[in-house]
Amino acid sequence: MGYLFTSESVSEGHPDKVADQISDAVLDKLLAYDPSSKVACETLVTTGQVVLAGEVKTKAYVDLQLIAREVIKKIGYTKGEYMFESNSCGVLSAIHEQSPDINRGVERQDPMEQGAGDQGMMFGYATNETENYMPLSLDLAHRILQVLADIRREGKVMTYLRPDAKSQVTIEYDDNGTPVRIDTIVVSTQHDDFIQPEDDSQAAQLKADEEMLSIIRRDVIEILMPRVIASIHHDKVLALFNDKIIYHVNPTGKFVIGGPHGDTGLTGRKIIVDTYGGKGAHGGGAFSGKDPSKVDRSAAYAARHIAKNMVAAGVADEMLVQVSYAIGVARPINIFVDTYGRSHVNMTDGEIARIIDQLFDLRPKAIEERLKLRNPIYQETAAYGHMGREPQVVTKKFFSRYEGDKTVDVELFTWEKLDYVDKIKVAFAL
């Protein structure tokens, strides 16, 4: 007998993701003007208010208020009725300098021996059930919300959409861990109050709410989902869609009050959405707002890079990689591998881990250089997942009244590149 597995995603307009995007926009601006910046930027967003806090060591000077407002505007919070709007919200900064104790403990004369910025364990995971080596349930949950955001921005259909939204996808697997069908899809989307009651009675209000919900449900099934399906080019995934899927659309009913006005948002509160949707494991450290000296971020990217290349090379159908560090120490304490009994090589998981240790330099500075992490590449990671995205080179422009304007070409999602497959095949004689 098989089993059901569920993953969720949240949109760029979800309050926690608004906070993540502001934190990473601050990080990007600082790295653009001073690549050696040490940054730990936390953001809180609530009704009409943004609060920035954290520790920074940098030679750059940036306009934090302007950065926050630009992010909020890009997401789509541009109307006063949202009670959180890019031009009118307050922006308070409580950012201060990084502790010199931490800096002394991490910096080294030889940059390659730079110590880890903190202790902790980080995980990378990959599975061959999708073309991007991600869990299918999470991949679909992200895709639904990305298409929903595209529809909102186009403004041609579903014109009542507001920025805040969530999705959840439940997949049925057989006993061999193969997806066999999509069981349930949940979509909750914030919307305008686009049908007004005929009078002030409770019955009239209920009728208007039910009419709105009926329209939203119809549009999700007849407009959103066909576009989601059209964006999929994998026959095995397309075969999982059928007319027996259970849809829960705005199951609590009316969803007009949302975003930071409906729920306070904080940086780092969607770490499972950011990674593997509950598959694999998570060490607990968030990503957004942290420069790559923080192994919470850089080592998690490195572990994903390893796991993805190992699965793509055919070492296993599924793999979890753990690395751990002590603060101020460059080399990882351990590398752990779990292939879930789905390995294709005649080795124990411990032996696989030892070969990984030989193939990949996991010192923080080596990770930074291999994955080009000292570049302004992070705002793009802060919505719809840090993993499973498409590596690409883009041109980014930064404007500063203090530092002048700057244009840089950067490579996004370098940890998703399959650039170690050939080396791995040689090492494992595949």
Predicted regions mapped to residue ranges:
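C-terminal catalytic subdomain
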Residues: R269-I271, Y276-L320, R331-D338
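Glycine-rich, mobile lid/loop segments that gate access to catalytic sites or pores
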Residues: T6, L66, K73-I257, G388, ...
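Internal helix-turn-beta structural module
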Residues: T46, A316-E318, Y325-L430
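Conserved phosphate/anionic-ligand binding catalytic regions in large, soluble enzymes, centered on
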Residues: E8-V10, H14-A19, G115-T130, V256-A281, ...
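Structured core elements
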Residues: A40, V51, L92, M122, ...
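N-terminal, positively charged regions that mediate nucleic acid binding
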Residues: M1-A40, V45, V421, A427
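Short, charge-patterned binding micro-sites
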Residues: A40-T58, I327-R331
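Alpha-helical support elements that line or immediately flank enzyme active sites
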Residues: E12-L31, E129-A149, K290-G314
